[in-house]
């Protein structure tokens, strides 16, 4: 009889204190919408770092092409209409700065997924996507102007062969810049979509799994 009372007392104390791991602590229930990477697999962090590295390489190539186009301005100053885009917009410079900044922040946010780095990376990628759209418009306009200038090379007072040569080089370089800009736009949109998808999933988990009431 005494043994039964001891067993009942042990069961009562076990139920009062709860079994280990049966109740989640406040740290487990407190999930932040601003930290979508913490609870995700490692491949998402690696994906974010890869996208950031692509942005950095893309920015370096855009800057290099812009410098090359600018260097052609001086020896062939009479063909400046092929390179007006480089000097009047300056897109290869400030575009490369934005793209390199967003890529660097994405890499850092993948390594250290804190709230501050994630917010900075998200905002910078939105800015880079906007810059890429503006750059696409500038480059498309430059290609259209170059095509019209190439058609007038035959009636030019200078050397028609040199005019065609410079126009072809400018068109090729600007077309390559346009391809890199479109690639940057796709990368930034993919990064933004990944953040939004992770935040939406975390928000649904918080709504569907509220803390247990005492």
UniProtKB/Swiss-Prot annotation:
Q: In which tissues is it expressed?
A: Expressed specifically in hematopoietic cells and tissues.
Q: Which InterPro entries match?
A: CD20-like (IPR007237), MS4A (IPR030417)
Q: Which residues lie on this side of the membrane: Cytoplasmic?
A: 1-49, 103-124, 197-214
Recorded topology in the membrane: Multi-pass membrane protein
For this record, an example GO cellular component is: perinuclear region of cytoplasm
Q: What does this protein do?
A: Hematopoietic modulator for the G1-S cell cycle transition. Modulates the level of phosphorylation of cyclin-dependent kinase 2 (CDK2) through its direct binding to cyclin-dependent kinase inhibitor 3 (CDKN3/KAP).
Q: How does it assemble?
A: Interacts with CDKN3. Interacts with CDKN3-CDK2 complexes through its binding to CDKN3; this interaction facilitates dissociation of cyclin A from CDKN3-CDK2 complexes.
User: What is this protein's record name?
Assistant: Membrane-spanning 4-domains subfamily A member 3
Question: Taxonomy-wise, where does this protein's organism fall, top ranks first?
Answer: Eukaryota, Metazoa, Chordata, Craniata, Vertebrata
């Amino acid at each position: 009889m005494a043994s039964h009372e001891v067993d009942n007392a042990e069961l009562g104390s076990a139920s009062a204190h709860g079994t280990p791991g049966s109740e989640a602590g406040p740290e487990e229930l407190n999930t932040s919408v601003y930290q979508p990477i913490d609870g995700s697999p490692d491949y998402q962090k690696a994906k974010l770092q890869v996208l950031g590295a692509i942005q950095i390489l893309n920015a370096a190539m855009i800057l290099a092409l812009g410098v090359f186009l600018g260097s052609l301005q001086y020896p062939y100053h009479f063909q400046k209409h092929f390179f007006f885009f480089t000097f009047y917009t300056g897109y290869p410079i400030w575009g490369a700065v934005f793209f390199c900044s967003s890529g660097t922040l994405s890499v850092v946010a993948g390594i250290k997924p804190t709230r501050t780095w994630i917010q900075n990376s998200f905002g910078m990628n939105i800015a880079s996507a906007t810059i890429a759209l503006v750059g696409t418009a500038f480059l498309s306009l430059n290609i259209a102007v170059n095509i019209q200038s190439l058609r007038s090379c035959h009636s030019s007072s200078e050397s028609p062969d040199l005019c065609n040569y410079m126009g072809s080089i400018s068109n090729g370089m600007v077309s390559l810049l346009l391809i890199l800009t479109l690639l940057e736009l796709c990368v930034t949109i993919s990064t933004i979509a990944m953040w939004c998808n992770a935040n939406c999933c975390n928000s649904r988990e918080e709504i569907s799994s509220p803390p247990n009431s005492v």
